[in-house]
Amino acid sequence: MVVIRLARGGAKKRPFYNIVAADSRNRRDGRFIERVGFYNPMAAESEKGLVVNAERLEYWKQHGAQLSPTVLRLAKQAAKAAA
């Protein structure tokens, strides 16, 4: 099953997350199918903190991908900011 979830990157105490479509059997930070966006909780005022490719997210949802609870919350947040 395909899951859209966060894959952690960045340094210690400086998290950075890629929003990825991955097989549910793969590790959190392991192999993924496609990068759909990113989330930077430590972003400065001048930087983008959340970017989501809504077209690709919708594509994966139509093909049966499940969104993790955090990605669902972030997708709603990104849609609200875009509107």
From Swiss-Prot:
Which UniProt keywords are present, listed alphabetically? Answer: Ribonucleoprotein, Ribosomal protein
What PROSITE patterns does its record include?
RIBOSOMAL_S16
Its BP terms in the Gene Ontology are: translation
User: Domain of life, per the record?
Assistant: Bacteria
Q: Does the keyword Nucleus apply?
A: no
Question: Under the cellular component aspect of Gene Ontology, which terms does the record hold?
Answer: cytoplasm; small ribosomal subunit
One function term, GO molecular function aspect: structural constituent of ribosome
Q: Which InterPro entries did the record assign?
A: Ribosomal_bS16, Ribosomal_bS16_CS, Ribosomal_bS16_dom_sf
Q: What family, per the record? A: Belongs to the bacterial ribosomal protein bS16 family.
Q: What is this protein called?
A: Small ribosomal subunit protein bS16
* Species assigned in the record: Aromatoleum aromaticum (strain DSM 19018 / LMG 30748 / EbN1)
